[in-house]
């Protein structure tokens, strides 16, 4: 035996040769510590699994201490692994082995027939393929689709993880929910809750989101086939998750008793009992090759020493220098108070405001002189209807006999549900409600910042009206739920967590990034010894930075103005309020009812409407009606058109009902106003007519074309070309969720835009139609419309066929034609296409035809495309004329040609139509301007040049508004949005952006559109 010492003379191990000893594997993940100890016969004699709540070293020491009696006086070898294990290994001198290697060791020893391992941890996820050599794919900094994601979803539904699992097993329907990170998923789940969707269905949908994230985000286009071994805590503890994986991957689940037996055939799902400890077991197996041995006392000493060590992390200034400064701060902000009146002594008229927000429900009732009689603030607990019902009963009880509720208004995500359920008199969009509340406290307010549970709303006020609105997109990092999630993950209440940051001496500089990126920063800070207070203060600063630099995008604090009102429940946190004031270097107003401002604004609005409409009593349900109130919901599919949209039917007392999830008015029994022009609908009908046009050639070759990206607008061109050559053309079906799902297994990256993801489904759709020849050209250039410095297509639109060919195994036996064409030069295109066609003839794929026929077909193709542009311009001009003659709002709904696809736009055009708006598209608006605007950016993309021209078009018309659809993952739109915004704002026009992806819930989009219409209507 040789004792090993470092340069300082400290002991860090013993060196033994060929001695039988115990082996310990320590797997320290992002949220848990797992330890397995093997005896000399490789039998498990100790295993443990526990959450470390970011106290990594202390928890590891604690769990090993529990094994003291088992280890006894035996020597032991140690291997550490896991995403958070390297720091422990380094400070203690233990051997560290990468977790993929140790997992492979475990698989080879216990499950050699395994083709693929799927392991989900707390914040880590990975797939290991064993066929064709070892290949591993891990998540990056995003914790979507992991245990942490499931924890966040349980918190949102206000159920335990065990209850979430049980709920999922009773599901009848799967909703589409994002899983790339928790804050996106919250944006999808909360509207479902507010619309009355069943928790059982939502629970199963959460697990399905994890499955989808694994397939698209981790597998990255590689097929998951054969015998699949599922490891990690989430897959062990959640039966519902195992069920979703098994069904989606079409596997046969092995009974637990067979999980340890050799498998002769593939296609099995293996869920071993050792799943939570599997990586630690692999580490213990790997420890056999180590030459370093330890006694229990050695291990305990090294771990205890590492607990007290800290590293180098960046710090910011303290929020408060001392308690005196904090007391001055509290005194100043305590002055901004709403008046109150004792409801027990008050008699007369009252006005009720309800704010059914994304995560909380707020209620305020005011007197005739705007004093608060009653208020309520609490979490939705996943069921806003029950909460509002209980509170309305309480309000009716307090008012009985002496107070008359003259009027009531509601706002927030649950506005329509609550209004229909309880006969609330008025609905008001959130932005206007918050503006009215802020004006009450400061009539001269020129900037309002509201940070709620999932929303950041910023309003610039000019001439006593909202001049500009800025909202966060689907990501809610930096909002109240952002802080709440961190607090809960560390074992603190929100109040305890925030209070800890007030007196923090060394706030950690965590930057301003999304939640899942921030998780890594927090873990690193804790690993380096940062206190909870330091992290709390650092997160408060991050919330502020996110609002200032990601949502508002300020360059200088002076842009915010002098009279700033902050509100929203998040600003009740003194640490965040202080961080905001320090960041902008000025004092702001935070009303004492900061978290109730939406409800207070509703009450003010209700009072205004009562006066203007001379209302003497609200139509809100009476006490008797509230006592008899009942509510049930059922999810179904609307059968009134081919889309078969998923809708939720809420049924209330007295045979009343409310339908949510609908994208048009048909389920409500209202016939759509077909007279209002909608160019999205017009374009789609035109494309459908093209698909059904042209001569059919029985017995001749059929060429397939996927309907998406660059083929959408160019379908008239290609359809005409192939038809006139004498070849049948088969276009893939119009996009649908089902079409997306049949191709999702080959999508190489979850960050690509949804229109590109759909192309995988379109190819599979054509293959399913037994098409053996598919034509999908690469196109660097678009038609030259003479509106930009060049006429490029974006790289995804131009070259996606290359990716499909490389990534889709189904194309191996298909003649997949992806030539490079430039349609902007007719002569060059004619030469290139005839060359391409002759090559296909020479290969025996097409029959030979006279080249004159080909050239004639090309001439007709260009004429067909010209006709398409002429028809679209004429329809745009008709729509503009209609809007003017009927005093209608004209919306230029800007995007890409493929945004007319209903699966991509999710019916946003119909939603705008339902508000009485006339819809035209960016190509028509662009063609109607006489001179193009000057841009600061290089204007070289055809589709994007249309956006700039459309912004100029809107700027010159009083009745026109600009709404831009942006697909998540579109890098170029990061530039176009800023440029379009600048063109509009310098002409005092609003810029409205709606981000869209595979999620089809329009709750947030509706709020944004209503805000835009309300504000532009007041100007």
Residue ranges of predicted features:
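Short glycine-rich, Thr/Ser-proximal phosphate-binding strand/loop in the N-terminal lobe
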Residues: 23-65, 135-136, 140, 354-394, ...
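An N-terminal assembly and electron-transfer interface module characteristic of large anaerobic redox
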Residues: 15-16, 139, 143-149, 388, ...
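Conserved phosphate-binding/catalytic loops in two-lobed NTP-binding clefts
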Residues: 97-100, 246-281, 425-431, 581-600, ...
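Glycine-rich phosphate-binding loops at beta-strand->alpha-helix junctions
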Residues: 84, 219-252, 272-276, 411-414, ...
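Glycine-rich phosphate-binding loop plus the immediately following alpha-helix
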Residues: 55-56, 132-173, 186, 276-279, ...
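Adenine-nucleotide phosphate-binding core of ATP-dependent small-molecule kinases
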Residues: 185-216, 520-549
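Glycine-rich phosphate-binding/hydrolytic loop that grips phosphoryl groups
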Residues: 147-152, 259-262, 266-308, 436, ...
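Acidic, glycine/GT-rich loop-and beta-edge segments that sit at the periphery of enzyme/chaperone cores
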Residues: 286-349, 457, 608-675
């Amino acid at each position: 035996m040789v004792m090993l010492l470092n340069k300082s003379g400290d002991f860090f191990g013993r060196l033994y040769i060929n001695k039988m000893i115990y082996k310990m594997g320590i797997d320290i993940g992002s949220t848990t510590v797992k330890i397995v100890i093997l005896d000399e016969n490789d039998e498990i004699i100790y295993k443990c699994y526990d959450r470390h709540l970011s106290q990594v070293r202390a928890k590891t020491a604690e769990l090993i201490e529990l094994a003291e009696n088992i280890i006894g006086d035996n020597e032991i070898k140690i291997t550490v692994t896991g995403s958070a294990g390297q720091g422990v290994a380094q400070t203690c001198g233990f051997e560290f082995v990468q977790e993929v290697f140790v997992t492979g060791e475990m698989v080879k020893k216990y499950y050699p027939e395994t083709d693929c391992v799927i392991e989900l941890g707390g914040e880590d996820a990975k797939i290991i393929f064993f066929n064709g050599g070892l290949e591993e794919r891990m998540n990056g900094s995003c914790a979507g689709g992991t245990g942490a994601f499931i924890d966040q979803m349980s918190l949102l539904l206000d159920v335990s993880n065990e209850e979430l699992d049980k709920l999922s097993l009773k599901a009848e329907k799967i909703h589409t929910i994002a899983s790339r990170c928790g804050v996106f998923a919250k944006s999808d789940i909360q509207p479902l809750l507010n619309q009355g969707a069943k928790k059982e269905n939502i629970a199963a949908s959460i697990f399905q989101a994890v499955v989808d994230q694994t397939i698209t985000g981790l597998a990255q286009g590689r097929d998951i086939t054969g015998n699949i071994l599922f490891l990690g805590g989430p897959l062990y503890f959640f039966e519902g998750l195992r069920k979703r994986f098994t069904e989606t991957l079409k596997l046969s689940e092995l009974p637990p008793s067979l999980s340890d037996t050799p498998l002769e055939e593939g296609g099995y799902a293996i869920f071993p009992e050792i799943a939570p400890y599997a990586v630690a077991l692999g580490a213990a197996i790997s420890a056999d090759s180590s030459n370093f041995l330890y006694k229990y006392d050695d291990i305990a000493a090294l771990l205890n020493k590492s607990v007290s060590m800290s590293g180098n992390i960046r710090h910011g200034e303290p929020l408060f220098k001392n308690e005196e400064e904090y007391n001055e701060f509290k005194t100043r902000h305590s002055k901004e108070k709403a008046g109150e009146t004792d409801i027990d002594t008050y008699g007369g008229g009252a006005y009720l405001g309800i704010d059914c927000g994304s995560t909380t429900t707020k209620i305020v009732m005011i007197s005739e002189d705007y004093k608060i009689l009653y208020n309520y603030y609490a979490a939705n607990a996943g069921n806003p209807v029950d909460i509002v019902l209980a509170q309305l009963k309480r309000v009716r009880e307090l008012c009985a006999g002496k107070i008359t509720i003259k009027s009531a208004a509601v706002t927030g995500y649950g506005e329509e549900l609550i209004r229909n359920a309880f006969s609330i008199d008025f609905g008001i969009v959130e932005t206007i409600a918050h503006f009215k509340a802020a004006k009450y406290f400061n009539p001269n307010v020129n900037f309002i910042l509201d940070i709620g549970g999932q929303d950041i709303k910023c309003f610039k006020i000019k001439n006593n009206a909202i001049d500009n609105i800025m909202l966060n997109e689907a990501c809610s990092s930096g909002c109240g739920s952002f802080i709440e999630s961190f607090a809960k993950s560390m074992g603190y209440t929100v109040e305890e967590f925030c209070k800890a940051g007030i007196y923090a001496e060394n706030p950690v500089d965590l930057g301003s990034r999304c939640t899942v990126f921030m998780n890594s920063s927090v873990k690193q800070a804790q690993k380096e010894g940062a206190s909870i207070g330091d992290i709390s203060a650092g997160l408060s600063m991050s919330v502020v930075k996110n609002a200032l630099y990601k949502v508002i995008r300020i360059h200088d604090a002076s842009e915010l103005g002098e009279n700033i009102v902050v509100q929203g429940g998040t600003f009740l946190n003194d640490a965040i309020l202080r961080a905001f004031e320090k960041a902008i270097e000025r004092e702001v107003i935070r009303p004492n009812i900061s978290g109730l401002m939406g409800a207070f604004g509703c009450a003010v609005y209700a009072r205004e409407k009562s006066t203007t409409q001379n209302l003497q009593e609200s139509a809100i349900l009476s006490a008797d009606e509230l006592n008899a109130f009942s509510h049930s919901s059922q999810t179904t599919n609307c059968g009134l058109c081919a889309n078969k949209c998923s809708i939720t039917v809420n049924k209330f007392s007295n045979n009343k009902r409310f339908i949510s999830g609908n994208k048009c008015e048909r389920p409500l029994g209202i016939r759509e106003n077909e007279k209002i022009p909608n160019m999205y609908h017009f374009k789609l009908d035109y494309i459908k007519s093209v698909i059904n046009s042209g001569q059919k050639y029985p017995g001749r070759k059929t060429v397939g074309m996927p309907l998406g990206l660059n083929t959408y607008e160019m379908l008239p061109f290609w359809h005409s070309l192939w038809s006139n050559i004498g070849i049948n053309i088969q276009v893939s079906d119009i996009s649908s969720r089902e079409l997306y799902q049949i191709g999702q297994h080959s999508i190489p990256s979850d960050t690509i835009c949804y229109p590109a993801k759909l192309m995988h489904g379109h190819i599979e759709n054509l293959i399913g139609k037994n098409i053996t020849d598919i034509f999908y050209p690469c196109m660097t250039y678009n038609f030259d419309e003479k509106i930009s410095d060049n006429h490029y297509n974006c790289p995804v639109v131009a070259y996606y066929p290359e990716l499909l060919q490389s990534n889709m195994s189904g194309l191996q036996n298909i003649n997949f034609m992806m030539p490079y064409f430039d349609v902007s030069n007719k002569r060059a295109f004619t030469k290139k296409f005839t060359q391409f066609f002759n090559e296909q003839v020479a290969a025996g794929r097409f029959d030979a035809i006279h080249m004159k026929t080909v050239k004639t077909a090309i001439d007709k193709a260009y004429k067909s495309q010209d006709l398409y542009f002429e028809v679209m311009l004429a329809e745009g001009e008709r729509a503009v004329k209609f809007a003017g003659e009927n005093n209608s709002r004209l919306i230029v709904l800007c995007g890409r040609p493929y945004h007319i696809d209903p699966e991509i736009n999710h019916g946003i055009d119909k939603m705008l139509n339902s508000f009485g708006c006339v819809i035209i598209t960016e190509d028509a608006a662009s063609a109607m301007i006489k001179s193009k605007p000057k841009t600061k950016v290089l204007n070289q993309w055809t589709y994007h040049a249309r956006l700039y021209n459309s912004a100029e078009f809107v700027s010159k018309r009083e009745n026109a508004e600009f709404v831009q659809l942006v697909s998540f993952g579109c890098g170029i739109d990061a530039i176009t949005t800023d440029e379009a915004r600048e063109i509009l704002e310098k002409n005092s026009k609003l810029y409205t952006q709606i981000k869209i992806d595979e999620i089809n819930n329009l709750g947030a989009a509706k709020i944004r559109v209503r805000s835009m219409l309300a504000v532009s209507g007041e100007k």
